[in-house]
């Protein structure tokens, strides 16, 4: 028997975050119809500080931009679970916290959204000097690499805020780059003009997937979440996150991936993982890939590490060091 009848879910206050929490709540209610799963929302540092691009935050702070205030709810027992976009979670979880489950992944791709009424169909159609709105260093680097004639300007805020900025009569933006999964969940699929695919754009580690975080010692909740686990998604995302962890990457470093999964039995999957690391301007890039049959979490992580080592062998090291020097230099100037 459950220890109680109410298991609060913690999430950010944005419309998308609440919708994502409702997705998890609906799944839990299917399995536990006699229990309640109220949603508690909070703003995080990442929601409150909108004047900086994501890659401009100090590395240590960037790791908890979207999570620190929510994790306090777990520690104080105000919530039993937290629902996140997996791509917002650091590759190494804080002490005492674990990802209890990763449900089935939505579309991991990035999408182009043009200004309302625009006649353009693809990003390649944009004339020189056109302004692309994004605060992601990965998206900026990949698009600059393939479309050097474009300009990139930071844009922050929730999806609705960014779309309003795009569509404003005096907007400087010609288009935005957004995660397709978020647009789908918000019912905004009709705003998508183009899906960005490899070899032009590789998506973020964990993009399109949700993650449910709990306290590591909450064995009851971990057990209750097992029916929501999607094995194929879990293995793919574990491989991607192991790659990022080995490279010590985060939102301040342009790391992109593409993962293809083929089920070969009820418990085994053939996973192909390609990773890339780019300089901030996109002019230099390293690529690495590997394929393996995966039937355990350990094997999934081994695949990610293999691709990370291939990236380092193929020139990712100097690029990563350059990002680190740039980050250290900026921090030194701020502290001067």
Swiss-Prot record:
The protein, known as: Porphobilinogen deaminase
Keyword tags: Heme biosynthesis, Phosphoprotein, Porphyrin biosynthesis, Transferase
MF-aspect GO terms: hydroxymethylbilane synthase activity
Pathway stated in the Swiss-Prot or TrEMBL entry: Porphyrin-containing compound metabolism; protoporphyrin-IX biosynthesis; coproporphyrinogen-III from 5-aminolevulinate: step 2/4
Cofactor dependence: dipyrromethane
Encoding gene (name): hem3
Modification sites for Phosphoserine: 327, 329
Record's function text: Tetrapolymerization of the monopyrrole PBG into the hydroxymethylbilane pre-uroporphyrinogen in several discrete steps.
Catalysed reactions, semicolon-separated: 4 porphobilinogen + H2O = hydroxymethylbilane + 4 NH4(+)
InterPro entries cross-referenced by the UniProt entry: HemC (IPR000860), Porphobilin_deaminase_cofac_BS (IPR022419), Porphobilin_deaminase_N (IPR022417), Porphobilinogen_deaminase_C (IPR022418), Porphobilinogen_deaminase_C_sf (IPR036803)
UniProt organism field: Schizosaccharomyces pombe (strain 972 / ATCC 24843) (Fission yeast)
Gene Ontology biological process terms from the UniProt entry: heme biosynthetic process; protoporphyrinogen IX biosynthetic process
Recorded family membership: Belongs to the HMBS family.
PANTHER family in the record: PORPHOBILINOGEN DEAMINASE
